[in-house]
């Protein structure tokens, strides 16, 4: 028997030890450390969708078919950068859902990391000047 979206979300939040928060449109809210918010919804009871607002100052990215599957797509909505992803509800189990959500959150954290802090040489790092 196929798991419904509501059952999948209840299992996910139970497994993570969290109270599930859902609004009237069946959109679940998942918060990480108070600085990342992921919205989880299901489109036409067929496509599970993850969505997060990245902020206004992030450069666009072309990761349409990047390193993740399902793909994490960065775009713009109402003047803000967003990240979204979707995959079929059919065959999606609790472990796959959790792994997908974790990869999505990791991707958000990497994209929100300031560009100037990605590489900071220390005193032992060899630096080549030409």
UniProtKB/Swiss-Prot annotation:
InterPro entries: Tir_chaperone. Pfam families: CesT. Keywords: Chaperone, Plasmid. It comes from the Bacteria. Changing residue 114 to S: In plasmid pYVa127/90. SUPFAM superfamilies: Type III secretory system chaperone-like. GO terms for biological process: protein secretion by the type III secretion system. Binds to YopT. Functions as a specific chaperone for YopT. This is Chaperone protein SycT.
């Amino acid at each position: 028997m196929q798991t419904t979206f509501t059952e999948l979300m209840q299992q996910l939040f139970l497994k993570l030890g969290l109270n599930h928060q859902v609004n009237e449109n069946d959109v679940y809210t998942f918060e990480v450390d108070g600085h990342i918010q992921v919205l989880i919804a299901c489109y036409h009871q067929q496509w599970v969708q993850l969505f997060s607002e990245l902020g206004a100052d992030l450069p666009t990215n072309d990761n349409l078919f990047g390193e993740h599957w399902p793909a994490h797509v960065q775009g713009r909505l109402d003047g803000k950068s967003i990240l979204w992803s979707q995959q079929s509800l059919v065959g999606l189990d609790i472990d796959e859902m959790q792994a997908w959500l974790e990869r999505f959150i990791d991707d958000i954290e990497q994209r929100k990391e300031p560009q100037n802090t990605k590489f900071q040489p220390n005193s032992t790092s060899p630096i080549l000047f030409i």
